[in-house]
């Protein structure tokens, strides 16, 4: 089953990063395309910490599975819309994961597989839960996560400058450190948020 989980993680992360790159391309920035990142090749998107270490750490500690991939290169000088354009690029990835979770849930619901005990239902629920984990984790407003891109767009200049210094100084290591320090609180947040969204999905199909 670990192979299935890794395959779901990998596929979800690739589509997440493709969404970033495609929205950036639509807003005038061809950097991701020029560097070959608008690709389904997983090796172009893998990051050893966020793509491998964090998901495996969460899996083996029994926490909700989440992670990320190597950030798609963005040239903000080419991007239309300024900070709001960057916010759109940032939110595109998590929204893709949310939509993947919703589509997988709807397929599982209307085929009935998520209510059975067979392997198909298990795989569908992995797709749902992993993508919801990616969605929730990546919308956290912590640099350099995607949620911080939205915060950049609405934050006062002073707050934005502090965020930029944090991102330049610590990068993804800040996120990794927070996961280690606040693992219990983060797991609780992720589980509660995931359950809340699943309840929303059930309500959408009239099963709640």
Language model features: what each stretch is:
Residues 1-208:
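Hydrophobic transmembrane alpha-helices and their immediate loop junctions
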